[in-house]
Each structure stands twice: as structure tokens, then as C-alpha cells.
């Protein structure tokens, strides 16, 4: 598989497919969620997605670090010990891997999400070391 040096997409035109929220996580309403992945890193640890959801309140578990950027609508989020926050168009947030949060969508929300799976600490150390070595041999900018 050869990956392009640059991948670009119009987030408004990404075709989403049904991606149901776990029924046990729904607090109220009948939220309908859809999503699509549009790219992945070479090593597979980072992926980019577009996700949307209709009205409802639910809990959400983050299996990976997830950076979200709201591109339409809004959502109110909260987590244990963290004040409630409404994210609207243009807002971004980071949800840490292994955490739970509560999401309340008043009408509709659409987000762009970047998911990064955490590496085991020993692998992480090796990656950081390899990057340091690679910097020494990096070609000079033209």
C-alpha cells in the first residue's frame, strides 16, 4: 500500500455511514450517529474521521486520544471533576484515551476527529529515540 504525501478532503462532502451509539451508554433521547474514516497514518496509530449525531444525551468512552473540531452545530460535554463545556463551531477539544465523558446534543453536531492510539511505554520510548536519530540525518530544507 502506497500512501500519498498529501491527503485532502472537503469535510462537508465526506459520506457518513450509520455508527450506532452503544444502547447502554444512552441516557435519554434516540441519538443517531454516523461516521466515516478518511485517512490513516502509515503506522496505523492515527486516523481521521468525520462524525455526526442528532439530539440526545449519552456517555462516551474514548479508547484513543481524540482531538475534535466542531464543524457544525454544538454539543455540551462534561466528565467527572470537569466543568460542563459547550463546544460550538470552531471549537476544539482533546479527550484522553481511557476516559469517559457525557455528551448532550441539543439538535445536531458534526465534528472532525483525529484519533491517536496510545503506544506501550517501551514502544513509545523507542519511537522517540528513533525520531531523535532521524533528525540528525534529516535532509536540509531547500
What are these regions (language model features)?
Residues 104-142:
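Double-stranded beta-helix
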Amino acid at each position: 500500500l502506497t500512501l500519498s504525501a498529501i491527503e485532502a478532503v472537503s469535510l462537508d462532502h465526506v459520506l457518513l455511514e450509520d455508527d450506532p451509539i452503544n444502547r447502554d451508554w444512552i441516557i435519554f433521547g434516540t441519538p443517531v450517529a454516523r461516521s466515516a474514516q478518511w485517512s490513516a497514518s502509515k503506522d496505523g496509530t492515527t486516523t481521521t474521521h468525520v462524525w455526526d449525531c442528532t439530539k440526545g444525551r449519552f456517555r462516551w468512552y474514548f479508547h484513543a486520544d481524540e482531538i475534535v473540531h466542531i464543524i457544525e452545530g454544538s454539543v455540551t460535554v462534561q466528565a467527572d471533576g470537569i466543568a460542563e463545556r459547550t463546544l460550538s463551531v470552531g471549537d476544539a477539544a482533546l479527550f484522553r484515551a481511557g476516559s469517559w465523558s457525557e455528551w448532550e446534543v441539543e439538535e445536531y453536531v458534526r465534528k472532525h476527529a483525529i484519533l491517536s492510539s496510545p503506544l506501550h511505554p517501551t514502544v513509545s520510548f523507542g519511537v522517540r529515540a528513533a525520531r531523535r536519530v532521524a533528525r540528525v540525518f534529516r535532509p536540509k530544507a531547500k
